[in-house]
Amino acid sequence: MELFFRKIGNGAPLIVLHGLYGASDNWITIAKHLAEDYTVYLLDQRNHGRSPFAGSHTYDDLLTDLADFFTQQKIDKATLLGHSMGGKIAMWFAAHFPEKTEKLIVADIAPKDYLPEKNDSSFNLHQNILLAMQEIDFLLVNSRNDVDNFLEEKIDDVRIRRFLLTNIVKDRLTKQYKWRINAAVLYDYLDEIVSGVNKNRLKQKAPITGYPVTFIRGTKSNYILPEDKILIKEIYPDAKIIDIPDAGHWLHAEQPEKFIKAVLE
C-alpha cells in the first residue's frame, strides 16, 4: 500500500503518525516548526485521509504499511513521533526495526492493553462515533453544518464534532460530501485498535534500550495514568517522560508550543 504523505523541511527524517480520526492535515502547524530541524513526513494512515481504504486495520497491517513507506522513500533511519493510535504503531515498528529507529516519541498513549477498559465511557464513545458516522445519508447533506446537526444528536462534545468535521470532503465527480475515514472497517476493528500494542506483546523484546525514548503526557488526559509510568519504565528503562500541564489527549493541539519543546528535548 502506498500511503499519502506530506514532506516538509530539510534534515534528518522524522515521521509523524496521527491517531484515530486524524490525518496529516492536523499536524501541518507542528510540522512547520519541527521542519527547522528535520525533514518531516506527515502520513495519512490506511483508512484515513487521502490514503487508500482497506478491509482490515490491525497493528500488523499498519506496521507493514510503515515498513513499506521506509522502503518506498528510501529512508534508512528515522525519528518516529506517534500520537495515540499512531504512538502504538510507532512502538510496534520500533520494536521490530530498532535499526531503523533513530528515536521514539510517543504522545499520550501507554504500552498497555486498553481493552479491559472497553466498558468505560471512552470505548463507548468511539463506538458511538463510528456508528454515527455510518448512519449519515450524504444524499441528504448539503453542507458540513447538516452533518454537525446530525452528529449533535449522538455526540455532545462540540470539540469532537469539530474534529470529525475536518474529515468531510466533497467528491470531485459526484460533488457529494463524504467521509475520508473508513468508519465501517474502523468499527469492525475497534477492539484491535483499542487493545493495540501492550506490555505482553512488547515484553518479548523488552527491556528496550536500543534507541532514545520519550513519552509526552497531557496531565488532563487519562490515557497515561501515574501508574503507567512504572509500566513504561519496565519496558523502556531509559525513557524520558514529560508532562504537559493543562493539556488533554490532543495535547499537540491544546499546547502546541510546549509540545514542540518536548519533542525537541
Language model features by range: what are they?
Residues 15-19, 83, 217:
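The conserved beta1-alpha1 loop
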Residues 1-15, 35-38, 75-77, 236-237, ...:
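Alpha/beta-hydrolase fold catalytic core
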Residues 138-192:
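Conserved alpha/beta-hydrolase catalytic His-Asp/Glu region
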Residues 32, 41-85, 89, 96, ...:
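Active-site loop/oxyanion-hole signature of alpha/beta-hydrolase fold enzymes
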Residues 92-95, 101-144:
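Flexible "cap/lid" loop of the alpha/beta hydrolase fold
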Residues 171-235, 240-243:
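Conserved serine/cysteine hydrolase catalytic core
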Residues 244-260:
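Catalytic histidine-centered segment of alpha/beta-hydrolase-like enzymes
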Residues 4-53:
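Conserved HGGG/HGGXW glycine-rich cap/lid loop of the alpha/beta-hydrolase fold
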